[in-house]
From Swiss-Prot:
The keyword Ribonucleoprotein applies. Residues 1-47, 254-277 are annotated as: Disordered. Belongs to the universal ribosomal protein uL2 family. One of its GO terms (biological process) is mitochondrial translation. It holds the Pfam family Ribosomal_L2_C. Residues 1-11 have a biased composition (Polar residues). One of its GO terms (molecular function) is structural constituent of ribosome. SMART domains: Ribosomal_L2, Ribosomal_L2_C. This is Large ribosomal subunit protein uL2c. PANTHER family: LARGE RIBOSOMAL SUBUNIT PROTEIN UL2M, RIBOSOMAL PROTEIN L2. InterPro entries: NA-bd_OB-fold, Rib_uL2_dom2, Ribosomal_uL2, Ribosomal_uL2_bac/org-type, Ribosomal_uL2_C, Ribosomal_uL2_CS, Ribosomal_uL2_dom3, Ribosomal_uL2_RNA-bd_dom. It comes from Cryptomeria japonica.
Length: 277
């Protein structure tokens, strides 16, 4: 994975840099593995009221159906055919042809190339891209696409460059260190994929212009200090005025820095040994 820097051919390419991958194949997605998606309201609820600010517009996308379960293809050898970009996520995806004739998309593990083979199941070897139950994975192994509930499919460590680490096993539970720094308990029967998610340098990209953000469906963010007093706690005043508060606040008057926003007494609290950093 490398980062491609653009020359200043136009103002839009000034300071522009994107992640590039020589092994990626520019191909149309599999038609049977794509579906249209209705992006409901772009941050609005069923009444048309904004519930999430700074969203709207964006390019139309086809949703790629990713196989996060991997359990339906136990002990069936699969071959990596293509490595493609997915506009719906930061990670690359791989098209896999299985020996039984079925084709699926999976997240691209770092280091996997076209022509490599993958396998799922309890007896799969500990190699890049293989999916196994946590009880069969050695301690210290880096993993991604980790299930939280058995059979539900991977939900943790799925973004570009994400990686979790198996650090302990005790009874029917295993202890994982997640990308956020959180340490939590997961059932030993949950599946995980060996290795790190590819496209590691995605976080180093520079979009360079406002239009690139609009293509992603992200609208401008207006600072509260330049609003009117009726619109934000930081607003109002003559000219460039300070916020007039002891500490920054959200548009709804809550503390903006350091206040915990996690729901109290959540069912998963018993599984978290150490909160994220």
């Amino acid at each position: 994975m490398n980062t491609r820097s653009y020359s200043t051919f136009t103002p839009g390419t000034r300071d522009k840099s994107l992640s590039s991958f020589d092994g990626k194949v520019k191909s149309h997605p599999q038609k049977k593995l794509t579906s249209g998606q209705h992006r409901c309201g772009k941050g609005r609820n069923n009444s048309g009221i904004i519930t999430i600010r700074h969203r709207g517009g964006g390019h139309k996308r086809l949703y790629r159906q990713i196989d996060f379960r991997r359990s339906e293809k136990n002990n069936i050898l699969g071959k990596i055919v293509t490595i493609e970009s997915d506009p719906n996520r930061s990670a690359y995806i791989c098209l896999v042809h299985y020996r039984d004739g079925q084709k699926t998309y999976i997240l691209h593990p770092r280091g996997i190339m076209i022509g490599d083979t993958i396998l799922s199941g309890p007896r799969a070897p500990i190699s890049m891209g293989n999916a196994l139950p946590l009880t069969n994975i050695p301690l210290g192994t880096t993993i991604h696409n980790v299930e939280v509930q058995v059979g539900k499919g991977g939900q943790l460590a799925r973004a570009a460059g994400a990686v979790a680490e198996l650090i302990a096993k005790e009874g029917r539970l295993t202890t994982l260190r997640l990308p956020s720094g959180e340490v939590r308990l997961i059932s030993e029967n949950c599946l995980a994929t060996i290795g790190q998610v590819g496209n590691v340098k995605w976080k180093n990209r520079t979009l360079s212009k406002a239009g690139s953000k609009r293509w992603l469906g992200k609208r401008p963010e207006v600072r509260g200090v330049v609003m009117n007093a009726v619109d934000h706690p930081h607003g109002g005043g003559e000219g460039r005025a300070p916020i007039g508060r002891k500490k920054p606040l959200t548009p709804w008057g809550y503390s903006a820095l350091g206040k915990k926003s996690r729901k109290r007494n959540k069912y998963s609290d018993v599984s978290i040994l150490r909160r994220r950093k």
